[in-house]
Amino acid sequence: NQIPIAVAAFANEELSPQLVSTIIRDDLNRSGYFRLIEVGTAIAETATVDFENWKGRGATALVVGSVQKKGEGRFDVRYKLFDVQKGEMLSGFSMDTPTPKIRLTAHKIADDIYEKLTGIPGVFSTRIAYVTKAGNQYRLEISDADGEGVQVALTSKEPIISPIWSPDGVKVAYVSMELKKPIVYIQNLMTGQRSTVANFKGNNSSPSWSPDGSKLLVTLSKGAIAQVYAINADGSDAQRLSNSNGIDTEARYSPDGRYIYFVSDRGGNPQIYRMNADGSDVKRITFKGSYNISPRVSPDGNTLVFISRRDGGDHVYAMDLANSNQELKLSDTNRDESPSFAPNGRYVLYATQTGRRGTLGIVSTDAKVKQKLTIQAGEIREPTWGPFMK
């Protein structure tokens, strides 16, 4: 049930290095919630709107705007959103935008349109992180949610694994093999500074943040079998939480911090379990299929996505935690890994394979909208979707 929307070219947008209206259209189109109506000419936000004309063309919403140059390297980007049926303005603002932030401003306008028309916050201005491999070089890269605007956070000859955003979107934790063993680091994306969180004997892996950003869950073997620990973000006070004779790993807090979901092969095959944040009261969560890994909880705590091996492939599944754990297969690809929720809970980013190449896919949590991200790189894996930025 898509919303028919007309996004006019912004007046004078050819003055800016990127066409604002094109970025907005691409965002809305990709979301799956909108059907774009052809417009033709540019329309400024100051123009008088002929609502009957737009009704006749089948639009229920109209976006207009302009771009004005403001001296060296700055633009004033203005926009208005109209409800065509009611003949009234729904939203609008102007943003003083430096040239490198034109894309971001366009994404923010698309976010505003999406939220005003669906009631759900938009995620076009959020960022993603992922690992690329070309030849024998690994790179931790950050980009816009559409795969554009790529920045390199780390380059290494050894594997980089399991990147994950801090709740404030300023840091990324990850595992690097650069010293020939897995070590967990935190890197500040603003300053480039990084610190070691876990470098114990044996395996240090699978970091994830507590909701308040003060702690991380990590998997440590400490020379024995891998178990789940909580550790302060400065690397102090590692406390063991899981206790089993199997491998326990891939631990994630629920958004309220009350529970931890994790993977264990204590019963013979990898399955997803839940325990209280202090490690007590362990319950098995997945019962279908003999291989279920990579649990991720939605921002509202109601949905669990994970990778399940069924029907000859590894697929992204969603489990409705609020409704008797009903399951829905989300992906139609079949070598999927590393699912990650968008911060609005409506989409899941994941890694998959196209041909023999690692690529990224996005699927809506109702499985209706599916898209591939086009990122110019060799192999792409280990995606993680960043939070809303303040």
Question: Across the structure, where does each feature detected by a protein language model lie?
Answer:
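Hydrophobic beta-strand positions that form the internal "hydrophobic ladder"
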Residues: 128, 169-172, 213-217, 257-260, ...
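Blade-level signature of beta-propeller repeat domains, shared across WD40, Kelch, NHL, RCC1
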Residues: 361-390
